[in-house]
Amino acid sequence: MVTQGNIRGGQHGVTLIELLVGALVAAIVIAAGFAVLTSSSKALTTNEQTIETQQNVRVAMEFLFQDIRQAGFGMNGPVGNCSTAIVPADNTTAGPDRGPDRISLVAPVGNPMGTATDPAWVLANDTSIGSGLPLALSSALAVTNMASEAGGSLTAPNATISIGGAITTTVTAAGGANLTVPTVLNPTTMKQNTPIYLLQCITYQIIPPPDPTGLCAGRSPCLVRGVAGGITAGVLDCTTPGSRCTSIADEIEDIQFAYGCDGCVAAVNSGTPDGIIDSQPLSAAGFDQADFVTNNAWATAPLTADKIRLAQVTIVGRQRRADQGFGESNRQTVQGTALQVSDHLHSDGVFAAGDFATVTPPYTSTRRRLLTRTIELRNLRH
C-alpha cells in the first residue's frame, strides 16, 4: 500500500551544487545580454556623434562656399566695414597660427521670389534709377523686412543696395514701399521685377569656450556668421556690442584660409593681373599648393586683398562628447596626434597659444573631421 509518506520520501529536491550552477548560468546569460546592450548603445552613440560632426562641417562649408563665391557682388566701393570684397584676418600674420582664422566679405542678401509673409524685394514697375524719383518695391512689408535685415534701419547708417547686380547705390530715405537713392547725372531705367539686393559686410568667426556672450547657446565652439558690430585687436569681432551674428554650425573647432592672388607678385607680369594665379617666389613652376598665401596681412602693395581670386578653406569639426568605448571606461584615445591644419599646429594652441592641454573634453578623446575646399571668387574675375 502506497502512503503519502512514501510519496514524499521518494521525492528529491535541488541540491546546493545544482542551485549554484543554475545561478551561475543565469548570471552569465544576464551579463552577456547586458554587455551586448551596452556595446550596442555605445556604438550607436559613437555613430550618431560621427554623423553629427560630418553634418556640421558640411553645413559650415556650404555657407562659406556660397558667400565666398559671391563675394564682391555689385560692389563699387566700401560696404560697411569691408573695404574690399574679401577682408582676410589671419590668426598670426607673422608666423604659424595659434588659433582659428577669420574672414569678412561683402555678400548680397536678397529675396527675389518672395512669399505671402515676406514679399519679394523687386521693383514694382519700370524705374529710372537716379532720376530723383523713389524706387517702389512690391509692398511696404518688403521694405520693412529689408530694414530688419539691415539691423533695424536702412538709413542709419545708409544701407548699400544693388539693383539687379548692375547698379549699386545707397539708401537715403525709406518710407512705405519706397526707397530713395541719390540722384545721378545719367539715370538708368530698370525693368519691373528687377531684384534688389542688400549688400552687407559679413564676418565668419569661431567662438571658443567658454562663450561669455552666449552666441553658441551652450554648444561652443561654434562658427558664427553675421555683421560684426566692432573691431577688436584690428579685426572685426562678432562678440562686440551691436553685432548681429548667429551660430550656423556647432562644434566647429578650427577654420583656416589660404588665398591665391593675381597681380600680387611684382615679378609676375610686372604685377599686372592677367587672369592667372601668380606663382609665389618659393613655389615651383606652374600652379601648386605653395601659391596659396597663408601668413599675410594683405595690407602692403602689391600683396593686397583686392588681388585675391581664390580661397582655400579648411574646416575642422569635433565630437561634442568623448566616446566611452566598449567597457565602462570613460576615456580612450581616438585622436592620438595633434592636427596640422594649414599653418596651424593644434599642439601649439587650439584656440589660443598654450591651451592644448586644457581643452575640454581632452583633445585626444574626441574624433575630428576635416574638410578642405578651393573656391573661386567669381565676381572678381578679369
Describe the predicted segments one by one.
Residues 372-374:
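A beta-hairpin/wing motif
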